[in-house]
Amino acid sequence: MLEKIFHLKENHTDVKTELMAGVTTFMTMAYILAVNPSILSASGMDANAVLIATSLASFVGTALMALLANYPFALAPGMGLNAYFSYTVVLTMGYSWQLALMAVFVEGIIFIALSLTNVREAIFNAIPMTLKSAVSVGIGLFVAFVGLQNAKLIVNSDSTLVTYQHFKGETFHSIGVGAILALVGVLITAILLVKKVKGGILYGILITWVLGILCELTGIYIPNPDAGMYSVIPTSFISFDFSALGKTFGQVFKTDFSGVGILNFFAVMFSFLFVDLFDTLGTLIGVASKADMLDEEGKLPNIKGALMADSIATCAGAVLGTSTTTTFVESASGVTEGGRTGLTSMTTGVLFLLAVVFSPLFLTIPSFATAPALIIVGFYMMGSALKIEFDDPAEGIPAFLTILAMPTAYSISEGIAIGVISWTLLNVITGKAKEKKISPLMYVLTVLFILKYVLL
């Protein structure tokens, strides 16, 4: 049955590997169950409703990815997009969260149309192989940087933007211990991987979590909610109260457009559209490259199914009551564990569904336990740098700028934009356009990206 659906032998994998990979991906993504409600509740949405909507939207999107594309990619409400939803559209622009959901819903409908007409697939295929490899490396650095932030190893600095965590001080027993445990987690995970222990990333998460529990029981780790450091000891395991979902489900269709100009609405919708489009393409490029799923021409077979799953999930998420649902870069953790088919993503999806019931348990997984996984995944994605033609400056410089932009601009889509603009302009100005056989679509993308920076 599973072999018939997911073609395990054809993809050189087995059930155990796929299940382990799916659990690993879920563990590295589980933080979204806590973070997304926290961010969206700032817009006035009910946090419990958003948690349930997040779980269900993640299940729908990830299950569709498994069935429509047979790829080990998982979906959930995207970070960054949720912050834009709450802090920009609602709190800064003053629109209702219902209108923001409608913008997300319309964006999803447009994406379905673009996926059916091969526009998104054409954009994916138009990006040169060098930039695709650079995107993979850039995402690796981005994911590792997110891991360092989640572990509180890297923190804000007024003078240098970021700095390392100072372990001494009044927050030592919360932030300091958490950061130290994250470092221990990186070491444990690295040792397991060097020893070729199957499921090393997952075991690293679990061992770090257990160490956190022991530290809390002995008073070494003291929860400090004000600093974002919560108890890591589960106090309850299940909850069957789903009534809160009614506070967000279907509210997208009750949007009040009075006082909202059509141009203003489409400006909001386009922002969601742009970021989601290139974040998704970037993630698919990066993770697929890591899994050696791209063919000789740099194309991803059956990409239409993957894009359709992403599009439908965005619409479903808006109806349920959450911001844009998109393909997650944390999928790379499951790929690193050997995940190669939709059985990996189906496993992750089912765990998101179970999370609706077991949310109290999953919400206690600390960020310092999952952060080591993200850091190690970043290391694994560095391998794509070997495919970049650094000896050709016309290829190497745009690739470098792509890699540099993603962690520093904190955006996958910005990295792609800078890479596309620099690659096209550099090759055209130096007379290499014919030699490189630049796709007409690359010219279109370059113009659109430049207009974006000029007008938005």
In which residue ranges do the predicted regions lie?
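Residue-level signature of catalytic and energy-coupling elements of molecular machines
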Residues: 19, 39, 123, 199, ...
